[in-house]
Amino acid sequence: MKNTVKLEQFVALKEKDLQKIKGGESRLPKIRFDFIFPRKK
C-alpha cells in the first residue's frame, strides 16, 4: 500500500505543477495520463 500512497502524493504534486502552467491546457491531460499510465512499448 505504500506505493499507492506515494503515487497519490506524486499525482497531487503534478496537479499543482500543471495548474501553474496555464499555457497548453489542451495538452496537459494527455501528459498527465502518460505520467500515471506509461505506455507499454
From Swiss-Prot:
Q: A single Pfam family, by name? A: ComC
Maturation propeptide residues: 1-24
Where does it localize? Secreted
Among the GO biological process terms of this entry, one is: establishment of competence for transformation
Task: Give UniProt keywords alphabetically.
Answer: Competence, Pheromone, Secreted
List the GO molecular function terms: pheromone activity
Assigned protein family = Belongs to the ComC family.
Q: Which NCBIfam families match?
A: ComC_Streptocco
By what name is this protein known? Competence-stimulating peptide
Q: Which organism is it from?
A: Streptococcus mitis
- List the gene name: comC
